[in-house]
């Protein structure tokens, strides 16, 4: 949840503090473990905790929930991201759920950003980002031969 090639390459300390570690644990317990149990496959975390310095180095905001240990970007091999996003929307408590860089022609493209705020103020905000703009909600799932594509 903390490994970063950018941090390694640039010599950035990406070690979370006690508060961030607690938040990462909450994300694991409330979101990642239920998702792993449903999928019966490993959940691949492409980005977890990011220090403020790392956020700045990659062009993200220092106020990102990643910097607080409250957010992860993820994928699961063999399951379309849209199917994962719909499952998360309907089965876990979350603050923000974003289908990042969604392309309807490539169900494996992009990734899912999901965050959790343990203080009970989760917004349940659902967005889709196509690389240019954010829209509210998730796109409609496409089906072929009884499978989500």
Regions from the PLM with identified roles:
Residues 27-31, 41, 54, 70, ...:
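Amphipathic alpha-helical interface surfaces
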Residues 57-67, 102-105:
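Short, flexible, solvent-exposed loop/turn segments with mixed acidic/basic and small polar residues
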Residues 1-38, 131-149:
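Extracytoplasmic cell-surface/polysaccharide-interacting catalytic and binding patches
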Residues 76-149:
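Catalytic cores and adjacent binding grooves of peptidoglycan-active enzymes
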Residues 8, 54, 63:
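Glycine-rich, flexible loop/turn motifs
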Residues 62-82:
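Acidic, His- and aromatic-enriched active-site or binding-groove loops in soluble protein domains
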Residues 44-46, 71-75, 113-115:
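Structural recognition of the beta-strand scaffold that forms the well-ordered cores
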